[in-house]
Each structure stands twice: as C-alpha cells, then as structure tokens.
C-alpha cells in the first residue's frame, strides 16, 4: 500500500448506492471517516466484512454521530444497492468504477490472465480522523474482521475534538 498511517488521506468524490455524491473533504473538521473497502459485492468474504461493519454500527461500537461509515468497491451503484438490500446494510456503499480512489489509496491490484489485465480492489479497513489524517490501514484477509477499526472509531470518539 502506498499510503501510510499518518499521511493525509487523498480526497475523492464517489457515487453512493443511492446515486448521491460523497466527497471525502466534506467531512474534514466534522467527522471521522471509516472506509470498509471490499473486493466484490455478494462474495463470501465481502458479505462477512460488510455485515460485521453493520453490526458495529448497530452495537454502537461505531459512533455514527461523529464517524461517517462507507463501504467502497469497484461495483456499480446498482450492484451495491442490491448488495446492501440483500444484506441489511444501512450505510452508504460507494462505487469507484473509474478506479481513481482505490488507485490513489494504493489498494488496487492488477492481475494478468492470458495477456489480459484485470483490476480488483484489495480488501481493507481505513480510518481517517477529522483532520483528514489516516489513522488505520488494515488490509488483506485481516480486514474481513473490522474489529481493529471499530476499536479505533470508539477511541477517536472519546478524544476531545481539536476543531
């Protein structure tokens, strides 16, 4: 991953599963941001990861009053909407169909199969504080379980705001 904890999070503008625009910089100074990046809607690991994020919201481990929560994938808004409905997800799922955000964050992998290149998102949980600084990057198979990110969201919630 090219970005590291302590780096400023690159801005992005993406569409939600409800075809609304979300811009990361709109949250700067207002809310922490939890990005749960998943590989492919409806796949087993991604379903498990997104359901665990929803459980974190439902249990209060992600304090949504000061933490914005988003799933992010290469899937279309329509695919994400169907995925959210099927799995009872009540947080926005963002579509990075042009791959710009995932590439900027260094979590886009290219695979070559029979001289054809295919790009996939790498599974990751990323927590960005209110100042726009990356506080956690948890990638790979570990990210199926967002427990580390949930704990950090709770910790950031308890810290006094500097804004």
Please give the residue ranges for each predicted region.
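Chalcogenol-based redox active-site neighborhoods
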Residues: 1-163
